């Protein structure tokens, strides 16, 4: 599932929804609204996963289509839930 994809591929930089590379660019709903083109939507999150931005690598061609969809859904859900207050 998405949690496993995240743990295996994203958590090095985004541990617990944070960001160890770029302060403030965390995975809370508020930060996603501010920093992602398109804001807090699954489409915007999926675009970021596929294409990367700045120090974040593109994952298209690395992750399978199913993994991209799963991790997108996971981040979307966590951003409005468990990670809502990450800063």
UniProtKB/Swiss-Prot annotation:
This is Cytochrome c6. Monomer. Functions as an electron carrier between membrane-bound cytochrome b6-f and photosystem I in oxygenic photosynthesis. It is found in: Plastid, Chloroplast thylakoid lumen. Pfam families: Cytochrome_CBB3. PROSITE patterns: CYTC. GO terms for cellular component: chloroplast thylakoid lumen. One of its GO terms (biological process) is photosynthesis. Belongs to the cytochrome c family. PetJ subfamily. The keyword Plastid applies. Heme c binds at residues 10, 13-14, 56. The lineage of its organism: Eukaryota, Discoba, Euglenozoa, Euglenida, Spirocuta. One of its GO terms (molecular function) is heme binding. SUPFAM superfamilies: Cytochrome c. Binds 1 heme c group covalently per subunit. PANTHER family: CYTOCHROME C6, CHLOROPLASTIC. Keywords: Chloroplast, Electron transport, Heme, Iron, Metal-binding, Photosynthesis, Plastid, Thylakoid, Transport.
């Amino acid at each position: 599932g998405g949690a496993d994809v995240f743990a295996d591929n994203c958590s090095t930089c985004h541990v617990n929804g944070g960001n160890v590379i770029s302060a403030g660019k965390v995975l809370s709903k508020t930060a996603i609204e501010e920093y992602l083109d398109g804001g807090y939507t699954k489409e915007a999150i999926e675009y970021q996963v596929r294409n990367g931005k700045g120090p974040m690598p593109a994952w298209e061609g690395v992750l399978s289509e199913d993994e991209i969809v799963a991790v997108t859904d996971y981040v979307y859900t966590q951003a409005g839930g468990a990670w809502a207050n990450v800063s």
